[in-house]
A protein has these predicted regions:
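Surface-exposed extracellular loop regions of Gram-negative outer-membrane beta-barrel proteins
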Residues: 68-76
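Short, basic alpha-helical nucleic acid-contact segments in DNA-binding proteins
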Residues: 93-112
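Short, basic interhelical loop/turn and adjoining N-cap
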Residues: 79-93
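Basic, short loop/linker segments at the boundary and entry of helix-turn-helix/winged-helix-like folds
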Residues: 44-60
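Phosphate/pyrophosphate-binding and catalytic-coupling "lid/hinge/switch" segments at subdomain interfaces
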Residues: 1-45, 109
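Catalytic and ligand-binding motifs that coordinate phosphates/metal ions
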Residues: 23, 27-28, 76-79, 124-173
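Short helix-to-turn junction characteristic of helix-turn-helix DNA-binding domains
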Residues: 61-69
Length: 173
């Protein structure tokens, strides 16, 4: 019985490795799309196609942030103007949209991965596996210039927040 189990386990690992190889090959070729479409797009025949109503919301998020509106205020305004059918607009969702390269038409594959051995927990790819970046993969919803400005502002705001003292006695000892 243990021989049968060991053989079945090896077969399962072999199938998994073959599937991963096929996915990575499609990533290299620029033809791979994962299962989830980002907000603003729908998947049609392995293509990301803009959904115009959602694309307008994405553009609103970018334009608001570029004129100085913060992510908290953007989320609050989205909940007033564009309530979600299945929930609430959160600051984290706004930040993810602002940081996602898919909105300039690019795809960055294998930012995270699941290792072959146990425990099978998804982890950040810090060079363990190759990453693939495909430019102009699909129609952009915002310009590269807008995206780059937003990334600069996000980085600056993150640095400012880290340097703020949260207590009157911080750095006094």
């Amino acid at each position: 019985l243990s021989m049968i189990c060991a053989t079945a386990q090896e077969e399962s690992l072999s199938i998994s490795k073959n599937q991963k190889w096929g996915i990575r090959k499609r990533m290299q070729d620029g033809t791979y799309l994962n299962g989830m479409s980002p907000f603003g797009y729908e998947k049609q025949e392995s293509q990301l196609i803009p959904i115009e109503r959602e694309a307008e919301i994405v553009r609103y998020i970018y334009s608001s942030f570029l004129v100085g509106v913060g992510t908290v205020q953007i989320a609050e305004e989205l909940n007033r103007r564009y309530p979600k059918e299945n929930g609430t607009w959160y600051v984290s969702a706004v930040r993810r949209i602002l940081m996602n390269e898919k909105y300039i038409g690019d795809v960055h594959h294998q930012k995270n991965f699941t290792p072959d051995d146990l425990p099978l927990l998804c982890q950040k790819n810090s060079g363990q596996l190759p990453q693939y970046y495909v430019q102009n993969h699909h129609k952009a919803l915002v310009s590269r210039q807008e995206f780059e400005k937003v990334q600069t502002l996000l980085k600056r705001k993150g640095t400012e927040r880290k340097n703020q003292n949260t207590c009157a006695f911080s750095n006094k000892l």
